[in-house]
Regions:
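PAPS-dependent sulfotransferase catalytic core
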Residues: 183-196
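ATP-dependent adenylate-handling active sites, centered on carboxylate activation for C-N bond formation
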Residues: 1-179, 194-196
Length: 196
């Protein structure tokens, strides 16, 4: 049968490209590694600002990768629908700053706030970056049933310290010993999409 297409994007030497290749090899996918230059990144900024209708530095920076990877997919494959990891940080306590939550109640309320506000910024940005290249994005981490279930889990089970328990600890634990991801990727420290 036909292999699943997977995609990664980054500048040459990016550690995220290396880890994405490890996962692709492990899963046996048809992997596309998209290496971009600083010039490619800078050249895309004006188009990205137009597409997402925002000048916000953080938003634009986070959108360039989505735009460039979806542009590559549109120009080089017959893929029309793509899956991404949007929402996993918000739903699954993936932001490093959450380890400093002063209480379990604060961790829970911040996670709920992030999910509630997600559609104002990240999802809209991502959708516009991807759809501007004629693709549709699917976001499994934002499935309503998954979000409702995950938010109902006690904060005690989701808390992390950044050392013994990394961000998205419970999600990582769910994949542990399942043979679905290599341990070196499953248990690696987080790197922001726009930084990797």
């Amino acid at each position: 049968g036909q292999k699943l297409n997977t995609f990664s994007i980054g500048m040459p030497g990016s550690v995220d490209l290396e880890y994405a290749q490890i996962v692709a090899d492990f899963l046996g996918t048809q992997h596309h590694q998209i290496k971009i230059s600083e010039k490619d990144f800078l050249d895309a900024i004006e188009t990205v600002i137009y597409n997402i209708e925002s000048y916000d530095t953080t938003t634009v920076r986070a959108s360039v990768g989505n735009y460039l990877v979806s542009k590559y997919i549109s120009e080089n494959t017959d893929c029309k629908v793509i899956f991404n990891g949007d929402g996993s940080d918000e739903v699954c306590c993936g932001y490093v700053y959450l380890k400093h939550a002063p209480s379990l109640e604060e961790l829970q309320s911040e996670s709920e706030r992030l999910v509630k506000e997600l559609h104002y910024f990240d999802v809209l940005r991502s959708d516009r970056s991807i759809s501007s290249n004629g693709l549709e994005a699917r976001t499994p981490f934002l499935d309503k049933a998954f979000v409702k279930y995950y938010l109902s889990i006690p904060a005690e089970m989701k808390k992390f310290d950044g050392e013994r328990r990394l961000e998205k600890y419970l999600l990582r634990k769910a994949f542990d010993s399942q043979g679905l991801l290599p341990d070196e990727v499953l248990w690696r420290r987080k790197c922001a999409f726009s930084d990797g």
